[in-house]
Amino acid sequence: MDYINAAILGVIEGITEFLPISSTGHLIIAEQWLGHRSDMFNIVIQAGAILAVTIIYWRRLLDLVLGWREPENRDYAAKLIVAFLITAILGLVVKKLGFELPETATPIAWALIIGGIWMIFAEWAAARRPPHKQITWLVAILVGIAQIVAGVFPGTSRSGATIFVALLAGTGNRAAATEFAFLVGIPTMYAASGYELLKTFKDGGAAGEDWTALAIAFVVSTIVAFIAVKWLLAYIRSNRFTLFAIYRIILGVLLLGMTATGMIA
């Protein structure tokens, strides 16, 4: 993989990983022209995106750790931990069952379309409720489950699934739902990336990697994800997610069309 392709894929990952539009769908399209990505490359660009969100929320994370004696912080942290543990346990079950990701774009396209329709419904339902910021235990449990659903059905979007489950479960404030979804995603994605990294090294998958290309992709993904998430957090203060829902539906239809015409597998 040349350095320009590595940078382009880093940009795509950085933009799409935490926006509710599915990084998987975009990377599949890019793969048709930029070549197949190794497991190591996928891990590296995702790690860059996770680092960006960690940097954005470092003060919030530090407050939760240092202020653990405060009931509000302790309660919030406990809900984050429970959501993460639910994802971790269900993730191990999915691995044990031998679940395999789809090899064609069609299921991903349908996940994009259905997810887009679901997002519009969730926004409509949330608008009919008081815009409170409370994260309930039900929200925490459902967010943990939603992360696994997004992993099992690529194209769903982890951020999209978790944010809109939180909205439907009673957190009527978009900013509060997004923050909880992103904070849960930090340990979840670090754990998943760490697991895959160890597995890749164990299987010899790191041999022959172009470490310069990996470094470029990592740095680009980190910078772009930082900008994208900062923009998203500002955007949702006064705007709904409807624009993303429409975009998902259009992308899903485009993928179905490209599959039907043989442009992609």
Swiss-Prot record:
An annotated Gene Ontology molecular function: undecaprenyl-diphosphatase activity
Membrane topology, from the record: Multi-pass membrane protein
Regions that span the bilayer: 38-58, 80-100, 107-127, 135-155, 175-195, 213-233, 244-264
Record EC number: 3.6.1.27
Subcellular location(s) per record: Cell inner membrane
GO BP of this protein: cell wall organization; peptidoglycan biosynthetic process; regulation of cell shape; response to antibiotic
Residues of the signal peptide: none
Catalytic activities: di-trans,octa-cis-undecaprenyl diphosphate + H2O = di-trans,octa-cis-undecaprenyl phosphate + phosphate + H(+)
Enzyme class name: hydrolase
Main subcellular location: membrane
Entry keyword set: Antibiotic resistance, Cell inner membrane, Cell membrane, Cell shape, Cell wall biogenesis/degradation, Hydrolase, Membrane, Peptidoglycan synthesis, Transmembrane, Transmembrane helix
Pfam families recorded: BacA
Cellular component, GO annotation: plasma membrane
Remarks, miscellaneous: Bacitracin is thought to be involved in the inhibition of peptidoglycan synthesis by sequestering undecaprenyl diphosphate, thereby reducing the pool of lipid carrier available.
Family, similarity comment: Belongs to the UppP family.
Record protein name field: Undecaprenyl-diphosphatase
Species whose genome carries this gene: Rhizobium etli (strain ATCC 51251 / DSM 11541 / JCM 21823 / NBRC 15573 / CFN 42)
